[in-house]
Amino acid sequence: MRIKMLPIVAAAVLVAGTASAQDMVVKIGHVGPTSGAIAHLGKDNENGARMAIDVLNAKGVMIGGKKAKFELLAEDDAGDPKQGTSAAQKLVDSKVNGVIGHL
């Protein structure tokens, strides 16, 4: 599980490494089908991301000497490319540090 979380932590270090607050918030976006014909796949993927973030937050990950709090912002793309584009744009507008998903 550590190896699978390494890319998320590495991305967070690169993007959030210069934050000035005592505790920094690292926003991770997730886009996947949580409705529609393949909703079960998107929900499983999102639940896995939530579990990984819970583990990171429980461990108290430090980035650049500051405690990092990870947050998951999730959007439903219903397995539709147009909705996927819109969902991804919402996450960009929310200034997420990285995005996972898009099955």
Region locations from a protein language model:
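Beta-alpha junction/loop-to-helix N-cap segments that form part of ligand/metal-binding clefts
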Residues: 25, 40-45, 59-103
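Preference for short coil/turn "hinge" residues that link or interrupt alpha-helices
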Residues: 7-8, 12, 31-34, 96
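Short N-terminal segments immediately surrounding and downstream of signal-peptide cleavage
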Residues: 23-35
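Gram-negative bacterial Sec-dependent N-terminal signal peptides
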Residues: 2-20
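Short catalytic helix/loop segments, enriched in acidic residues and glycine
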Residues: 46-58
